[in-house]
Design a protein with these regions (language model features):
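Membrane-embedded beta-barrel scaffold of Gram-negative outer-membrane proteins
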Residues: 332, 338-344, 348-356, 576-653, ...
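Conserved C-terminal beta-signal and adjacent last beta-strands/turns
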Residues: 38-39, 377, 381, 393, ...
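Acidic, small-polar-rich N-terminal luminal/periplasmic segments of exported/outer-membrane proteins
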Residues: 50-183, 584
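Structural signature of Gram-negative outer-membrane beta-barrels, strongest in the C-terminal barrel
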Residues: 245-247, 383, 402-421, 426-432, ...
Length: 775
């Protein structure tokens, strides 16, 4: 097989052993498609690798190329920044759950918010200590919930980057979606596991007779009841991606998908807190304010509720619908000049209703029996992201100096709104009266207060009556009068990857200019706040090849990010965050006879004008302040192959991320894990009756304390740390002439229980059995 790097090419996608399940309906679709398309090509076909794509011919857990660092296909060792690649084979082996779990084995990432939180955005993550809200899909901002079935690989870029406009300084997550494979065919698989977990999944590529058109059909169905008192979720995903070669030098592409989730909002009402008077300064009383914390109301994670706890009931709902559309066009003017356009639209509509007993407080009427009041909420959020990107790549030489120049423009528009949020609380006299009126008219019995003794005595609160969504919409008051927010961002950027000294040294220089407009409107369409601004940012990095196997790299950059915070006194929007970052380190490949590769990096990031605004469940208001933050640390990533059939991936990070300045000084940043270690390994039997059997597993160890909230009043709500083990096995065989792969995954093998992120716990031990058939 020949491998060429050409300006325009057919994307190559890796066919691993699919672990998720495909729907029977889509099998029929694929079978129908296969009558219209015929396989074309032989094993000697030339594979052309596009400068805009990153699929590799080789498989495995390691990767040698990236597109996220420079905007074009580039060797990882030539990029002057830390980039971690999660390959499709690693995803197949390690992933049971969702996109969140796919990132568990990156040592610099932790989840910071709960899933199903009643907002249109996915879970936020902490990267190098900073909360990250910018999830990219194929290099384009506007990340909503990403179904695992869409993902071909994930690239995590550490630190700010001039390519991506309003990026967070800790880094960004770029999801590379699946495109049609070079060869026709695919897989269908089925699975079943604990907690009534079932699923079906299909992934099939069809190609036209002349090989110009490729279509990839994707489908995924999952359903499970969960392991909590009331839990469970059903997911249905349908997707189609395609490429078409208009000419030898011009190719179009698209992807369309719809992902629907229904179930109980368990992660929205899973865990709880308690207020315990604490003598923080050791003076013998609990009446002082110590570093912003009132001793009488010191708040901690709950100490008495069982791990199966959930305060929602069967009358609560979670319903989310996410739609994706991406179109692209590439054209090659010559071997050294390529242009690409990509347009993306993401729409989401999410509705959730929940009953929550959030914080248990001291009970003056019955000391020792803490009490919590109910919060019954219905909310709907809708978000639309539309992004258009145009990139022009030009390669040229000036004497002995080689250039890879990227010129780009990105237009991003976001509209966020929805039908609002409505709530009725048992602890509010006026709202309790409305609940009592609904009860009188319907015969429902509502629980206004929950006591510690109720939990300890096993009261079945999950069987309680709750207001229906229509009752909350009809009788509750809307929490706020905001209608929609609009964000319009224009980004111009230029990067040049310059190679000197016979390619022994390369410098990456970049500049980015951003113009943004933000506006929010009240109900009725009246504009209540607006903000305009612009900024120019720079990036400068370099890679020096010490020898063929070891490279030194360094990178400095600043970043600029609009934010949604408003001054509570004036209502005016607060200006953007700014940040400066520096990192340096070593990248090494093929050490010890080609067995060891990896990287080590040190970094420092400073971020200013940070709106620290977190919902406070005690007051049901937002605590807000403007601070400065700083994070520094060391990261190590290793890929080791003791033998050809044994792979080990290990990573470690030490991160010291705290608030600096005059407000909340010394508070650790939310989700920042001081020490985090991950390891994943697999071993393939290469001889004997079990030839082909692949076994492995991984461990994730996080050392606390891990801050759960970003405000000072909740500084004692922390996770002490945890260790989780996961196992898997795959066995390929033949049934007649049909290739079949059997699999088993055990997630959280020791059934460890911990608070994964703010008010959300991890999943209980899960067994998943799967069978996959090649089509």
């Amino acid at each position: 097989m020949n491998v060429l790097f050409s300006p325009l090419a057919t994307r190559v996608a890796t066919n691993g052993h699919a672990r998720f399940i495909r729907t029977t309906l889509t099998v029929v679709l694929a079978s129908f498609a296969s009558t219209l398309f015929a396989q074309d090509g032989t094993d000697d076909d030339v594979i052309e690798l596009s400068p805009f794509s990153v699929e590799e011919v080789e498989g495995g857990y390691g990767s040698t190329v990236t597109i996220s660092g420079t905007g074009m296909r580039t060797s990882l060792k030539n990029v002057p920044m830390s980039i971690n690649v999660i390959t499709s084979e690693f995803l197949d082996d390690s992933l049971i759950g969702d996109f969140t779990e796919a990132l568990d084995y990156n040592s610099s990432i932790t989840q910071t918010t709960r899933n199903n939180l009643g907002a249109s955005r996915p879970s936020s993550f902490s990267i190098r200590g900073f909360r990250n809200r910018n999830l990219l899909v194929d290099g384009v901002t506007g990340g909503l919930y990403i179904p695992p079935q869409m993902i071909d690989r994930i690239e995590v870029v550490k630190g700010p980057n001039t390519l991506y406009g309003q990026s967070d300084p800790g880094g960004l997550i770029n999801v590379i979606t699946k495109a049609p494979n070079l060869k026709e065919g695919g897989t269908v698989s089925f699975s079943a596991g604990t907690n009534a977990r079932i699923g079906a999944k299909m992934d099939y590529t069809a190609r036209s007779k002349n090989n110009k058109l490729g279509l990839r059909f994707l489908a995924d169905y999952k359903d499970h009841e969960g392991w909590r008192w009331v839990d469970g979720q059903e997911t249905v995903f349908l997707g189609l991606s395609g490429t078409y070669d208009f000419t030898e030098n011009t190719q179009g592409s698209f992807m369309v998908g719809d992902n629907q989730q229904k179930g109980f909002p368990s992660q929205r009402a899973t865990w709880s807190f308690e207020r315990t008077p604490t003598d923080l300064n050791g003076d013998g009383d609990t009446v002082d304010n110590v570093d912003g914390v009132n001793e009488s109301n010191t708040r901690y994670n709950n100490s008495f509720i069982p791990k199966e706890y959930v305060s929602s009931t069967a009358g609560n709902i979670f319903d989310s619908d996410n739609n994706f559309l991406t179109v692209g066009l590439r054209h090659s003017f010559s071997d050294t000049h390529n242009i690409q356009y990509k347009g993306t639209i993401h729409d989401t509509d999410q509705t959730v209703s929940f009953r929550e007993f959030n914080t248990f407080s001291p009970n003056s009427a019955d000391p020792g029996n803490k009490i919590s009041d109910s919060n019954n909420t219905w909310q709907n959020s809708r978000t639309r992201d539309e992004v258009h990107t145009l990139n022009d790549i030009i390669g040229f030489q000036t004497g002995d100096v080689r250039h890879q120049l990227l010129l780009g423009y990105r237009k991003a528009e976001t509209v966020a709104g929805g039908l609002g949020s409505y709530r009725l609380r048992g602890g509010n006299a006026g709202e309790r009266a409305i609940l009592d009126d609904i009860s009188a008219r319907t015969g429902k019995v509502f629980r206004h207060f929950l006591y510690q003794d109720d939990i300890l005595n096993g009261v079945e609160i999950w069987k309680d009556d709750v207001p229906s969504p229509s009752e909350l919409r009809s009788f509750a008051s809307r929490n706020n009068q905001n209608d929609r927010t609009f964000t319009d961002i224009d980004t111009f950027y230029v990067t040049d990857n310059i190679y000197f000294m016979e390619d022994r040294l390369n410098i990456l220089a970049g500049i980015r200019h951003i113009d943004f407009t933000q506006k929010s409107t009240l109900l009725g369409g009246i504009t209540n706040a607006s903000l305009k601004g612009n900024d120019t940012n720079f990036q400068l990095g370099g890679v020096y090849r010490i020898n063929e196997k070891v490279n030194f790299f360094a990178n400095v950059a600043d970043a600029f990010e609009p934010q949604s915070g408003a001054n509570p006194d004036t209502g005016e929007l607060i200006g953007p965050q700014t940040s400066d970052a520096i990192e340096f380190g070593l990248k090494f490949t093929d050490l010890f006879d080609g067995k060891l590769s990896g990287s080590i990096a040190a970094f420092n990031i400073q971020k200013d004008n940070v709106v620290r605004r977190d919902f406070n469940p005690v007051t049901f208001l937002s605590d807000q302040s403007v601070t400065s933050d700083e994070s520094e640390g060391i990261e190590l990533e290793l890929f080791y192959n003791p033998t050809e059939n044994w792979n080990i991936v290990a990573a470690y990070s030490w991160i010291d991320a705290v608030v600096v300045g005059d407000v909340a000084t010394g508070l650790r940043l939310e989700g920042a894990t001081p020490h985090r270690f991950t390891l994943f390994t697999n071993y393939t039997v290469d001889d004997g009756p079990l030839k082909g059997l692949r076994i492995g597993g991984g461990v994730v160890h996080a050392e606390g304390p891990i801050q759960q909230f970003g405000n000072i009043a909740n500084r004692f709500v922390t996770e002490d740390g945890y260790t989780e083990f996961n196992l898997f096995a795959r066995y390929p065989t033949m049934i007649g002439e049909q290739p079949v792969t059997y699999g088993i995954n055990v997630d959280n093998a020791t059934d460890t229980f911990y608070v994964r992120s703010r008010a959300a716990t991890n999943e209980a031990r899960t067994f998943l059995f799967s069978v996959s058939l090649d089509l």
